[in-house]
């Protein structure tokens, strides 16, 4: 029965526009039983966009505007983890999480947000006025190799939404809602001296589809 604490801090400085950020991180783990543990984590994370985005310029109402002074996108990450060592060869992990994204680059009076951008080129003037949320739960059940058999099942249920420059909340492009992955295998020792391995492995994967805007 013991507590473990981790503290950290990181910083970034972008010389192009002289923006900087300081990001604290913290984690607390409570092992309250040899087989059970709970962990709570928080982190502030920042992201710089692709360099070419900062050099986009456009003429707006007779004035030249650019993305040169875009700030870092930021996100508060909160996570809770429950670990259960069921026995010497089975393990269960449950991880609910919540992420709040802010200062996201968006186009004013538009549904465009950098969160959904997937094209190689960008020709829009952006402002750090968007936001978003991601929340869900990840579950992993794993059996390590025993009697030549192993498996790992991972499942995720989640929601991903964003608010763009028109102040309307929408589902993000990657809001698939669910993921399920099943991996399993069996090994047999074969040959006269049982020194060779014959293995059979398989994987099944399901996920929800990407969001898209229908063409009228």
Name each region found by the language model:
Residues 1, 7-9, 22-26, 38, ...:
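Hydrophobic, lipid-facing positions within transmembrane beta-strands of outer-membrane proteins
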Residues 1, 16-20, 69-74, 129-133, ...:
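Short sequence motifs at beta-strands and strand-loop junctions characteristic
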Residues 1, 32, 45, 67-68, ...:
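Feature marks flexible
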Residues 2-5, 35-38, 88-92, 147-151, ...:
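Repeated loop/turn-to-beta-strand initiation elements of outer-membrane beta-barrel proteins
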Residues 98-100, 121-210:
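Gram-negative outer-membrane beta-barrel transporters
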Residues 9-11, 19-35, 84, 154, ...:
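Transmembrane beta-barrel strand/turn architecture of Gram-negative outer membrane proteins
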Residues 1-15, 21-25, 35-78, 98-124, 141-143, 147-159, 203-216:
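Surface-exposed extracellular loop regions of Gram-negative outer-membrane beta-barrel proteins
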């Amino acid at each position: 029965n013991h507590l473990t604490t981790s503290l950290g801090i990181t910083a970034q400085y972008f010389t192009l526009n002289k923006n900087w950020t300081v990001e604290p991180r913290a984690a607390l783990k409570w092992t309250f039983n040899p087989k059970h543990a709970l962990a709570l984590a928080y982190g502030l994370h920042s992201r710089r966009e692709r360099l070419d985005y900062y050099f986009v310029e456009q003429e707006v109402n007779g004035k030249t505007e650019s993305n040169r002074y875009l700030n870092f996108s930021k996100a508060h990450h909160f996570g809770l983890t429950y670990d259960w060592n069921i026995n010497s060869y089975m393990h269960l992990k449950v991880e609910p999480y919540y992420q709040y994204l802010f200062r996201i680059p968006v186009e004013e009076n538009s549904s465009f947000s950098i969160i959904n951008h997937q094209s190689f080129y960008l020709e829009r003037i952006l402002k750090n006025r968007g936001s978003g949320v991601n929340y869900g739960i990840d579950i992993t059940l794993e059996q390590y190799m025993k009697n030549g058999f192993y498996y790992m099942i991972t499942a995720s249920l989640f929601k991903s939404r964003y608010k763009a420059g028109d102040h309307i909340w929408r589902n993000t492009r990657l809001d698939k809602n669910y993921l399920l992955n099943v991996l399993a295998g069996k090994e047999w020792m074969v040959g006269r001296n049982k020194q060779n391995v014959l293995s059979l492995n398989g994987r099944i994967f399901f996920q929800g589809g990407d969001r898209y805007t229908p063409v009228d």
